[in-house]
Amino acid sequence: MNTMNVNIVTPNGSVYNQDNVEITVLQTVGGDMGVMYGHIPTVTAIHTGYVKVHYTDGIDYIAVSDGFVEIRQEKTSIIVQTAEKAEDIDVRRAESAKERAESHLNNNDEDTDINRAKRALERAENRLKVSDLLK
C-alpha cells in the first residue's frame, strides 16, 4: 500500500509530522473527508475538531482549531491556529478553560467579549472530546 506524509503546522511551527500514513480523516466545512495516497489535489477549510491519522504502526488523534488543509498526492499539510495530540491534552486545564468560558458567557457584563468566550468554550470542549477518544 502506498502511504503519504501528514504535517500539522501552527503559527509556532510544525507540531505533528507523520510518515507512512495510510488514511487521514478530517472534519471539513463540507463534512468528514478521508484522504489517502493519490488523492486529487485539494485546498479546503476545516472546522475545530480533530484529525484522525491512521499510519503503519497505529492511530493518532489531534485536536485542531479552524484552519485549512492542502492535499497533494503524497502529502497532506494542515494549517491551524492550535493543534494538540490527544495524549498531550491536560484534561484539568481543559476543564478549567471550559468553566472560565462558561462563566464569561453567563456573565452579563458588557465588557465580556462574547465571541471570544464562545471560541474558548468550543476549543475547551473539543480538547475534552478528543482526550476521551483515547479511552
Swiss-Prot record:
<feature type="compositionally biased region" description="Basic and acidic residues">
    <location>
        <begin position="90"/>
        <end position="103"/>
    </location>
</feature>
<dbReference type="Pfam" id="PF00401">
    <property type="entry name" value="ATP-synt_DE"/>
</dbReference>
<keyword id="KW-0472">Membrane</keyword>
<dbReference type="GO" id="GO:0005524">
    <property type="term" value="F:ATP binding"/>
</dbReference>
<dbReference type="InterPro" id="IPR020546">
    <property type="entry name" value="ATP_synth_F1_dsu/esu_N"/>
</dbReference>
<comment type="subunit">
    <text>F-type ATPases have 2 components, CF(1) - the catalytic core - and CF(0) - the membrane proton channel. CF(1) has five subunits: alpha(3), beta(3), gamma(1), delta(1), epsilon(1). CF(0) has three main subunits: a, b and c.</text>
</comment>
<dbReference type="GO" id="GO:0005886">
    <property type="term" value="C:plasma membrane"/>
</dbReference>
<dbReference type="InterPro" id="IPR036771">
    <property type="entry name" value="ATPsynth_dsu/esu_N"/>
</dbReference>
<feature type="region of interest" description="Disordered">
    <location>
        <begin position="90"/>
        <end position="115"/>
    </location>
</feature>
<comment type="function">
    <text>Produces ATP from ADP in the presence of a proton gradient across the membrane.</text>
</comment>
<keyword id="KW-0406">Ion transport</keyword>
<dbReference type="GO" id="GO:0046933">
    <property type="term" value="F:proton-transporting ATP synthase activity, rotational mechanism"/>
</dbReference>
<dbReference type="InterPro" id="IPR001469">
    <property type="entry name" value="ATP_synth_F1_dsu/esu"/>
</dbReference>
<dbReference type="Pfam" id="PF02823">
    <property type="entry name" value="ATP-synt_DE_N"/>
</dbReference>
<keyword id="KW-0066">ATP synthesis</keyword>
<keyword id="KW-1003">Cell membrane</keyword>
<dbReference type="InterPro" id="IPR036794">
    <property type="entry name" value="ATP_F1_dsu/esu_C_sf"/>
</dbReference>
<comment type="similarity">
    <text>Belongs to the ATPase epsilon chain family.</text>
</comment>
<keyword id="KW-0375">Hydrogen ion transport</keyword>
<protein>
    <recommendedName>
        <fullName>ATP synthase epsilon chain</fullName>
    </recommendedName>
</protein>
<keyword id="KW-0139">CF(1)</keyword>
<dbReference type="InterPro" id="IPR020547">
    <property type="entry name" value="ATP_synth_F1_esu_C"/>
</dbReference>
<dbReference type="GO" id="GO:0045259">
    <property type="term" value="C:proton-transporting ATP synthase complex"/>
</dbReference>
<keyword id="KW-0813">Transport</keyword>
